[in-house]
Amino acid sequence: GIGSLINSTEGVLFAEMAVLSDDSTLKSITLSDGTGGNRVIINYSNASNRLTADVRVEAVGQAFMQTYSYTITNFLKIALKYKENDFALWVNGTEVATDTSGSTFSANTLNRLGLDNGASGELLFGKVKQLQVYKTALTDAQLTSLTT
């Protein structure tokens, strides 16, 4: 598995991607333990041009962020930073949402990268140019550079 490449306590999930259609169906990319209960998720949501980011620990929401500001069928550079009390969603060089209250996972919880919701649902039908996982929460300057 890839568990050794993922830090469960902090990190960044980054993707440069576009969905095939804005059809109001859920499409997701996650770091998880194979369930929907422990996950870091970037989600093309069930509303037109809605992009969400969510962190769940033991099925309890720790952070939730969203934006409606982008055309999701265009390629977007998206980064979700997760660290205890420090969550942020970045899109195309801009920090679009933050959450400053929430926990992360115990060490070695996350061990799966999936183009789904963490439990084999909400499959991502899209085009992916880049997919990266960072084991530390990057700085704002690093996230700006990564997503620009």
What residue spans do the PLM features occupy?
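Surface-exposed coil/turn segments at beta-strand junctions on protein surfaces, enriched
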Residues: I6-S8, D22, T71-T73, S106
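Short surface loop/edge beta-strand patches of beta-sandwich-type extracellular domains
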Residues: G1-E10, M65-S69, A119
